[in-house]
UniProtKB/Swiss-Prot annotation:
Disulfide bonds: none
Protein name: Cytochrome c oxidase subunit 5A, mitochondrial
Alphabetical keyword list: Heme, Iron, Membrane, Metal-binding, Mitochondrion, Mitochondrion inner membrane
Cellular localization per UniProt: Mitochondrion inner membrane
Gene from which the chain derives: COX5A
Keyword Metal-binding: yes
GO molecular function annotation: metal ion binding
Chief site of localization: mitochondrion
Length: 15
């Protein structure tokens, strides 16, 4: 996961 605002526990929506 490349969390920008979210953490790495989030999904890869912030690619």
């Amino acid at each position: 996961s490349h969390g920008k605002q979210e953490t790495d526990e989030e999904f890869d929506a912030n690619l």
